[in-house]
A protein has these predicted regions:
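Active-site-adjacent structural elements that line small-molecule/cofactor binding pockets in enzymes
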Residues: 1-296
């Protein structure tokens, strides 16, 4: 099992993000992930904050400060950027990190942000599907060709391409708190792993079973991965029945990890507490030293 942490970049300076990534690597964790917004409309500032560094630029910076740890997006909102711009940025991060990039993708949720960016909110799913196909095509050859509903290109060189072949792993995220049928379908058709956000254990199991069934019916023979993302909330005393997944004592959280690992999950990604950098470091230390050991 690989363990990653999602940095709450809306409340971090670049130096703080660097210190957390370096500490995560020192502790033997496997991945550091960052989220994505371009504009912080009221719904975003209410839930998170207004400070949103560009995720690709931040990951490239962290690549120069780390050696081993994987660097990923959780998640890039695909409609926000031209497909070729996103493909170039992702390929560059994969190059400067020497093949450590994980390309988490989603369709977005804040309609007000789409309005200001002059993007069609109700077409974001279809647009994202087209963009994934276009990005894969851009990465597939030095002079790629693609004809899609929203983007078409050809007759030009695209370089650099990613280090990883055929491309960095594409993790498909979905709306938090419930199994997103469109995201499961998108992953079955176009993704490499399902990256559900904030689901309970039963929903993770049901959603992953649906994903594998859809992929099989579409003729896919490769194994689709599972990489849940949940809040890590470690308590000294057990929370007992009725607790949220991955929240409770070390033993309770470790039991949850063993359950998703038995389903086939190769990754578990955790949102860190938002009570400041020292609390985030303590959570990473407990994850690395206590939870990993207990779940092994």
């Amino acid at each position: 099992m690989n363990y990653g942490v999602v940095l709450p970049i809306w409340q971090l300076t670049a130096a703080e993000a660097e210190s957390l990534a370096v500490r995560a690597e020192e502790l033997g964790l496997d991945g550091v992930f960052v989220p994505d917004h371009i504009l912080a409309k009221p719904a975003t500032t209410q839930h998170y904050g207004g400070h949103w560094p560009d995720p690709f630029s931040l990951l490239a910076f962290l690549a120069g400060r780390t050696q081993r740890i994987r660097l990923g997006a959780s998640v890039i909102v695909l409609p926000y950027r031209n497909a070729l711009v996103a493909a170039k940025a992702a390929a560059t991060v994969d190059q400067v990190s020497r093949g450590r990039f994980i390309f988490g993708v989603g369709v977005g949720w804040d309609e007000a942000e789409f309005v200001d960016l002059r993007l069609p909110f109700r077409e974001r799913g279809r647009l994202s599907d087209d963009y994934i196909r276009a990005i894969k095509a851009a990465w597939a050859s030095d002079v790629p060709e693609y004809q899609g509903s929203y983007v078409s290109f050809g007759g030009a060189t695209f370089s650099p391409r990613p280090v990883q072949r055929p491309h960095p792993p594409i993790w498909v995220g979905g709306a938090p708190g419930a199994v997103s049928a469109p995201a499961v379908r998108r992953c079955a058709e176009l993704g490499d792993a399902w990256h559900p956000l904030g689901l309970g254990l039963d929903d993770i199991e049901k959603g992953y079973a649906t994903l594998r069934d859809l992929a099989s019916r579409r003729g896919r023979r490769d194994a689709l991965g599972l990489a849940p993302r949940n809040l890590l909330d470690l308590t000294e005393a057990p929370k007992g029945s009725g607790r949220a997944a991955f929240q409770g004592s070390v033993a309770e959280v470790a039991a949850d990890i063993r359950r998703v690992r038995a389903l086939g999950a190769a990754w578990m990604t955790f949102d860190l507490p938002r009570e400041g950098v020292p609390a985030m470091i303590r959570a990473m230390e407990r994850l690395a030293r206590e939870v990993k050991t207990t779940a092994a």
